[in-house]
């Protein structure tokens, strides 16, 4: 257990940061799943509305990943890998008929 004031403060700050980071990571996972669900929807009914929905959710996911990297929640390589993986899956869905 921490004995001095600065150590106690660091514990509080670390816990606060952990919760914020957890929130970012959870939201990234949610938006990734949402994007893939929209891809499935597009695959079943390929029309321009569904394609726009896929592109919008993809841009939302990319934006949040970039923000997480900027705030050091994710490492830049990890963020790039996540974006690449999502983009590869979306590209496969959009090109396969």
Curated annotation (Swiss-Prot):
Report the domain of life of the source organism: Bacteria
Any Pfam family matching the protein: Ribosomal_S20p
Which SUPFAM superfamilies does the record match to this protein?
A: Ribosomal protein S20 (SSF46992)
Q: Which residues form the signal peptide?
A: none
Its cellular-component GO annotations read: small ribosomal subunit
Its GO biological process annotations read: translation
Q: Name one GO molecular function term.
A: small ribosomal subunit rRNA binding
Q: Looking at the keywords, is 4Fe-4S present?
A: no
Keywords linked to the UniProt accession: Ribonucleoprotein, Ribosomal protein, RNA-binding, rRNA-binding
Q: Which family does it belong to?
A: Belongs to the bacterial ribosomal protein bS20 family.
> What function does this protein fulfil?
Binds directly to 16S ribosomal RNA.
Give the protein name, as stated in the record: Small ribosomal subunit protein bS20
Give the lineage.
Answer: Bacteria, Bacillati, Cyanobacteriota, Cyanophyceae, Synechococcales
